[in-house]
Design a protein with these regions (language model features):
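Feature captures the catalytic cores and cofactor-binding loops of soluble hydro-lyases/lyases
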Residues: 11-301
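Single conserved hydrophobic/aromatic residue that forms the stacking wall/gate
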Residues: 2-13
Length: 301
């Protein structure tokens, strides 16, 4: 907590705390097995609220003129859930296959994790529910790219190999306006071998439908000289989702002590020069000049 508070990142700590212990009940894509419409036929949002009502304020008034608790009770008494379940029967499914009871959750660690370490001193974000278990703890060899176009070309032409960490940088709020790294994540996740053996690490962002071992929002971003800007080919990147860490643990393919890594990064930082803004006019030029880091929300100051 003190780590985040000392950097003015109390909200990051709050998100981390809320996710740890949060029950994960829903088995729909991309993190789960079934299409999103099955969520509706399993009872949808009301069913989720029914499962978690012990932590809800059931006495709050709603637009129906009734309290939340009264609305949920009405749905139950009107046979809403039984009507929904008939569609699932056609697929030989039960409601519990889509929405688990609270005490039988798929997981109890939420769906989002904030990682930090010497690669992301302010933090980075991973949707761990879509990451293959074998990638929860991994040490990978860095393949840095200064834009998504170069990275996806390398993936599609098979220049990226199992055991690599694809680093896409200068795509954060100040770097390029923080576009979505959708094409690269899909190219990796759709390859059975790469999806379970490499990771994508970026100061850019992802969509809610992304899947696979993708870590985004790395802060500070490359455009302001964050550690992600200093990574070179072959550096070793360690991911440890259970420990919530993301660190550079080796240089040029060889693991070394943290103090040695810090010394090398300090040398590289002394030689680093910021890139010119790729936008010369318009809204994106204004945004990139005034945006704060992604971990703080990427808003304009």
């Amino acid at each position: 907590r003190d780590y985040y508070a000392s950097r003015g990142l109390g909200d990051v700590y709050k998100r981390q705390r809320l996710h740890r212990g949060a029950h994960y009940l829903l088995n729909v894509r991309p993190a789960g097995e079934w299409p999103a419409q099955f969520f509706y036929y399993a009872g949808g949002v009301p069913r989720i609220m029914e499962e978690i009502k012990s932590v809800l304020h059931l006495d709050v008034m709603t637009v129906t003129g009734k309290t939340l608790g009264e609305n949920l009770e009405d749905l139950k008494n009107n046979g809403y859930y039984e009507k929904c379940g008939r569609y699932l029967e056609k697929w030989n499914l039960k409601r519990e296959d889509i929405i688990r009871p609270f005490d039988q959750a798929f997981g109890t660690d939420g769906s989002i994790a904030i990682l930090h370490g010497n690669l992301a001193p302010e933090g980075a974000v991973v949707k761990h529910t879509v990451v293959p278990r074998e990638m929860f703890q991994a040490t990978l060899k860095a393949r840095p790219f200064d834009c998504e176009e170069d990275a996806i070309h390398a993936v599609l032409t098979h220049e990226v190999k199992p055991g690599d960490a694809v680093i896409i940088r200068y795509e954060g709020p100040k770097g390029s306006g923080m576009p979505e790294m959708f094409y690269t994540t899909e190219a990796i996740a759709s390859d059975p071998e790469l999806g379970a053996s490499i990771a994508l690490i970026t100061d850019g962002r992802f969509s809610g439908a992304s899947k696979g071992p993708a870590i985004g929002h790395v802060s500070p971003e490359a455009a302001v000289g964050g550690p992600i800007a200093l990574i070179e080919e072959g550096d070793l990147i360690q991911i440890n989702i259970p420990e919530r860490s993301l660190s550079i643990v080796g240089i040029a393919g060889r693991e070394i002590e943290p103090a040695g890594v810090d010394a090398v990064l300090a040398e590289r930082r002394a030689a680093w020069k910021p890139k010119a803004n790729r936008y010369t006019s318009g809204t994106l030029k204004f945004f990139t000049e005034h945006a704060v880091s992604a971990i703080q929300g990427g808003y304009m100051e």
